[in-house]
Each structure stands twice: as C-alpha cells, then as structure tokens.
Amino acid sequence: MKFSAILSAVFASIAAVSAIEPAEGRQHEIAFIVDYKIKQQPELTQADVAEWTNGETITLQYHAQNNEAEEVTIIGVSGTFIEPSTGNVKVNMTAATIGPIVVAPGESHVFEQNIPLNVLPDHYLLVPQVYVAHEEKVKHVAIRGQLATVVEPNVSIFNPQLLFLELVLLATFAGFGYFVYEFWGKQYFKGTAPVAAKVKRAASPSSATASGKAYDESWIPEAHLKQKKTKKAA
C-alpha cells in the first residue's frame, strides 16, 4: 500500500518537481547508473556537438543498471535545455511518467524518451532527468549532458505553405495587372493605335492603250480628229 501511495503522489507531482528542481540541484546518492545514446545518431559521444533541426523528434535511448541491493523503480523522465556558458535554464521539457519499470538488483533495463524539438535556434546543453522510486522515496538520478546546436529547417520551394503563399502573390499581381489594364491601359492603347495607310488604286488602262495608240484621244476635239483623218486619207 505504501508503494502504491508513493506512485500515485509521484504521477500527480512529477511535473512540478522537474520544474522547480534545476539540473544542478538536489540529487540523491544511489547506485543506479543511467546512460543514454541518441537513437537517430548512435555514433554521438559526450564530447561531440549534436546538430538538430527544429520540428524533428529525437529519441533518447536509456540504459539503466541497478547496482543497489534493493529493486529500483523507474517512474518518470524530464529534462532541460541549458545555456552552456552560464548554466541558465532556457527550456524545461514537459515531464512524462514511465512504466513504472521495476529493475531488480543486479539487472538492467532499456527505455526511451521522445523529445520533440521546438526551441529557439541556439547552442544548448541538453540535460535529461530520470526519476526513480527507491526506499519509499522519489529520487533524481544524475545523468550526463549532451551539447547540441539547434537550427531552423531549410525551406523548400515545394513546401505547401510556401506554395500557397506563392499562389496568393501570383493572384494578387494578376488582379492588379488586370485592374491597371482595364482602367488605364486599354484607353492608352486605343489612343495610340497605329492608323492604317490608305492604299491608292492604280488607274485603269486608258482607251489609248486598249486601241493600241500611245495617247488618250478622249480629250481631243472631234473636229480636230476628223481633220487628222481627212489628211491621212489624202
């Protein structure tokens, strides 16, 4: 009954405990060794600087070894993002309950913690926190930190949000262009439209050409023409 009461109290207050207890704060001496690796980057060591991108989720894969003479129960995880140079806490991660996972003396256990990244781009020291129940007390197990740099993701031109913005801008410019053409451009182009040049008709062949003569006789007085014909006859 006592152990059940402890667990109930822990599940109700673990978030508050992790919020008020800084990473460098009170820790309990316990022969319960916890280490971890980044599941997505298993080659990383404590001496390396991890590179993470906002929006992704990293998974801490813990390995816990119980060197106590009594069983130890893993009951929760939390953590903080700390400023590496000053030690100031920048982000407190939401505490989460686990199990409970009972680890017998001399045995080990593997468990995981998912951490969605949504922090300001910067340099951090990630300090995970594991909470256990031992000897009817809740204890905070000391765990190493991991240096990391968090950056914003690269924006692709095929990003749905960017595509939507591009379509909105395109529609806006198209509407503006149509408005300018309708209220100003159309009148301008009408006023400066080129005037087609008039084509002169070619003169019809003269009667002189039709009759085989080199000139037009229509304008010559009839008396003069008769006189010319009389001379030719003579």
Curated annotation (Swiss-Prot):
It holds the Pfam family TRAP_alpha. This is Increased recombination centers protein 22. Residues 184-234 are cytoplasmic. It comes from Scheffersomyces stipitis (strain ATCC 58785 / CBS 6054 / NBRC 10063 / NRRL Y-11545). Belongs to the IRC22 family. Residues 1-19 form the signal peptide. Residues 20-162 are lumenal. Keywords: Endoplasmic reticulum, Membrane, Signal, Transmembrane, Transmembrane helix. Its main location: endoplasmic reticulum. It is found in: Endoplasmic reticulum membrane. The chain crosses the membrane at residues 163-183. Coiled coil: none annotated. It is a single-pass type I membrane protein. It comes from the Eukaryota. Is probably involved in a pathway contributing to genomic integrity. The keyword Transmembrane helix applies. GO terms for cellular component: endoplasmic reticulum membrane.
